[in-house]
């Protein structure tokens, strides 16, 4: 395992250019891990992720790092260099991976609500 997030793990593979994401059944609320698990939550997250990435590619919005879904709760992705400081992107770089996170909720809550209130 290369990285452990709140609800996702990143694993190396035999291919140095490909990583494996494993979505867990853990729950994250207000940026904290809850000790309870939701059965098949990892599978649901993986299927939802794959759906949106495939849709983005089919509609020619942009390319993604998704290679394939290789099991219920896992997918293979292309390894990319994530530049964490915007000023660190070389001006002559032609392909830049922009990390985006989408959180879908029925209503605005948590840290997103606090940011919205601050304007």
Walk through the language-model features, giving the residues of each:
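Active-site loop/lid in soluble adenylation, ligation, and acyl-transfer enzymes
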Residues: 1-119
